[in-house]
């Protein structure tokens, strides 16, 4: 309800803002895009007779870097995030290091609950102009904030060649060097420009993906091969079912991720940030859904919604009903590890690999985890100072390495793999005590596979709907006509997207 009210507030403010801008134009007074305010759009259930929010466009304006870049002004930069004590401790160490270079840039680091809590608080504060300088974000968060152009674009900052003086007597260019740009894992970096206008709104901070966890002890004992394609996955499930008829061979945590990833692997349409947004009702997508329905009917799989909890619980189970494979977040590796006994021994060894692909060379795995965005402010020096801080954290190999080891998330830089401490961390990788290192190692090995989906006001609705669609199609009574049931389910999902998006 709160999100819905804020959505209405936002739509009204956009209309008033447009009127005000028109009036200013008539009076030959330039409109200041930095003064626009916004609240959150409702991605879950807006009435269609409510004002339709605008889509983000280039009219939001590309941030113009001051001629002198950072002028040494004393500023306080507020950073909203979700870090617990262990990660905040790492951050604080690097804030201190940053302040040795820029003592007049004071960082106010604030933990704001969950990712959704950050989104909701920022959205509320945008309506009254008290938003922070920097915030953890996901793409759909930025799409909401951008309904009124609240997020500063980063393109001019990234490309700036202005030389900035630091307190230790050294200098750096304000923007990114070619070497720094090239060090980012491509899929993580590309996420910042997926909003339909070609502009860069976010920088990757720390990331995760989905990986395939499997019971290595069971696989080795039964001569099973780890599936690398979906065809091999079906064969593996069949063999496991023969060996253990009570098992559910595969658990998949995120129905939405599964659907979207299959679209990426097939190269079929899902959504678009511009034009017609909801494109997922097509023959290719209906076909793979039908295939997974057949797997479900054979008892090969379950999902988080169907199981009623994360499928890691089924994977680590020592009861009669268990799974031997689980597809879930790379950042949750320790939850995929069974409990050790009193002597520290685990009931089985866990293996980790890339999720199955189609075998068509179009390998894709989802990019997840927080990015950071910078908000527009009246004082351009706050934006520039915010950029310097974000640049410092996202290009620091030492910070990325230490943060990754503490968090279980994956660093966003390729070169972190060569960091001595991180290389030692990866060298310990195993399917027991150091399972987080094994997960990170797999993630780094598949750095060319990462994808992100278009972000727009309504993209989270599409995500929810395709997840619900997959669940429904696995279990629904088809009345003897599976194709008709699936077609209707797709049509209904599109209608829900158009109504609520």
Which residues are covered by each model-predicted region?
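Short, low-complexity disordered leader/linker segments with a strong preference
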Residues: 1-76, 100, 491-501
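Conserved C-terminal helix/tail region of periplasmic/extracytoplasmic solute-binding proteins
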Residues: 42-47, 52-57, 220, 430-432, ...
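Short, polar/charged alpha-helical segment
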Residues: 66-68, 84-106
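Short, well-ordered beta-strand elements
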Residues: 73-84, 105-110, 134
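Extracytoplasmic/periplasmic substrate-recognition and gating elements
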Residues: 100, 106, 128, 198, ...
């Amino acid at each position: 309800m709160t999100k819905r009210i804020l959505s209405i507030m936002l739509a009204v403010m956009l209309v008033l803002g447009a009127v005000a801008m028109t009036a200013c134009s008539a009076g030959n007074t330039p409109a200041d895009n930095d003064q626009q305010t916004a609240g959150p759009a409702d991605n879950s259930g807006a009435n269609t007779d409510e004002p339709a929010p605008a889509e983000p466009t280039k009219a939001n304006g590309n941030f113009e870097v001051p001629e002198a870049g950072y002028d040494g002004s004393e500023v306080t930069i507020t950073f909203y995030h979700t870090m617990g004590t262990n990660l905040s401790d790492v951050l604080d160490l690097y804030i201190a290091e940053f302040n040795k270079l820029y003592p007049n840039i004071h960082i106010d680091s604030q933990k704001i609950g969950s990712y959704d809590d950050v989104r909701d608080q920022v959205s509320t504060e945008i309506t009254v102009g008290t938003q922070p300088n920097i915030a953890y974000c996901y793409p759909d968060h930025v799409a909401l904030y951008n309904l009124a152009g609240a997020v500063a674009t980063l393109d001019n900052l990234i490309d700036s060649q202005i030389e900035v003086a630091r307190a230790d007597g050294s200098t750096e260019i304000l923007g990114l060097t070619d070497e720094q740009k090239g060090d980012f894992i491509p899929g993580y970096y590309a996420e910042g420009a997926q909003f339909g206008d070609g502009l860069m709104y976010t920088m990757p901070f720390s990331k995760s993906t989905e990986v395939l966890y499997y019971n290595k002890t069971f696989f080795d004992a039964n001569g099973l091969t780890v599936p690398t394609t979906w065809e091999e996955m079906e064969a593996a499930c069949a063999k496991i079912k023969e060996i253990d008829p009570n098992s559910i061979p595969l658990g998949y945590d995120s129905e939405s991720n599964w659907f979207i990833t299959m679209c990426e692997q097939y190269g079929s349409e899902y959504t678009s940030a511009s034009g017609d947004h909801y494109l997922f009702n097509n023959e290719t997508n209906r076909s793979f859904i039908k295939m997974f329905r057949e797997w479900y009917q054979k008892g090969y799989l379950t999902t988080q919604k169907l199981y009623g909890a994360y499928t890691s619980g089924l994977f680590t189970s020592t009861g009669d009903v268990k799974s031997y494979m689980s597809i879930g977040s790379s950042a949750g590796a320790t939850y995929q590890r069974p409990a050790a006994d009193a002597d520290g021994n685990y009931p089985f060894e866990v293996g980790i690999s890339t999720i199955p692909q189609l075998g068509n060379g179009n390998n894709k795995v989802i990019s997840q985890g927080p990015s950071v965005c910078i908000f527009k402010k009246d004082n351009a020096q706050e934006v520039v100072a915010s950029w310097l801080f974000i640049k410092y954290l996202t290009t620091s190999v030492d910070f990325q390495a230490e943060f990754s080891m503490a968090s279980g998330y994956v660093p966003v830089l390729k070169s972190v793999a060569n960091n001595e401490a991180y290389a030692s961390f990866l060298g310990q990788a195993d399917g027991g005590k150091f399972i987080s290192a094994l997960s990170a190692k797999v993630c780094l090995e598949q750095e060319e596979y990462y994808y992100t989906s278009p972000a727009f006001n309504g993209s989270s609705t599409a995500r929810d709907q395709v997840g619900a669609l997959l669940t429904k199609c696995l279990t629904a009574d088809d009345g003897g006509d599976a194709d008709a049931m699936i077609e209707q389910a797709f049509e209904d999902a599109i209608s829900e997207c158009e109504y609520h998006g």
